[in-house]
Regions:
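Conserved Rossmann-like nucleotide-binding pocket used by diverse enzymes
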Residues: 7, 28, 115
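Active-site neighborhood of divalent metal-dependent phosphoester/pyrophosphate hydrolases
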Residues: 21-35, 52-60, 156-159
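Short, basic/hydrophobic alpha-helical segments
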Residues: 14-19, 42-45
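Single conserved hydrophobic/aromatic residue that forms the stacking wall/gate
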Residues: 1-8, 13
Length: 179
């Protein structure tokens, strides 16, 4: 999806690099490029940031011997990270029951976010939104014997939602609230 905007578009590359500095960490949640390994290599040389790739179904270039993996710190299908004391579950495909989903901080705020792509802005995304609301409206009894709602913080990081602009976790959370 990034490649759809960036390939052949100096403005997209300039805008992106205007926000992303050399040492910023950038996690791409799949479908980086529909191009060949050579085309993807060329694109990657022009992007700022320390890059990490969660592989998507269109990232076929990764399996090509001509692809230079050195531009990435790591390439994985799934990862769990920490960002400001929050757990972040990353996968190209949405995971409806993700690790850490029930974890809350001292104030009762969810501590875990599941970031995904793949479904774009499709009927599948509408179904996921319905699932999220059903889950949030479902009550359960916590360890203290109190009734609580089930947290469900799945965020679709579809690049068109952010106008192809790289966003921080806080920015994705805020954008997701407004959608």
């Amino acid at each position: 999806e990034i490649a759809q905007c960036l390939v052949g578009s100096e403005m997209c590359i300039r805008d992106r690099n205007g926000k992303v500095r050399k040492n910023d960490e950038v996690i791409i949640i799949g479908d980086l490029s529909l191009g060949t390994a050579e085309q993807t290599n060329e694109l990657l040389t022009r992007l700022n940031g320390r890059l990490y790739l969660i592989t998507g179904n269109h990232d076929r270039f990764v399996r090509q011997p001509e692809f230079h993996t050195s531009r990435f710190t790591w390439i994985k299908p799934y990862e769990e990270l920490s960002d400001n004391k929050r757990k972040v579950v990353l996968c190209h495909y949405p995971i409806m029951c993700y690790n850490g989903q029930y974890r809350l901080d001292e104030e009762g705020n969810p501590k875990t976010y599941m970031l995904y792509g793949h479904v774009h802005d499709t009927q599948d995304q509408r179904l996921l939104e319905q699932f999220r609301e059903i889950t949030r409206n479902t009550k359960t009894i916590n360890a203290s014997g109190e009734e609580q709602s089930i947290p469900c913080n799945m965020i679709n990081c579809f690049c068109m939602y952010s106008d192809y602009e790289p966003l921080t976790l806080d920015e994705w959370i805020e954008l997701n609230k407004r959608r």
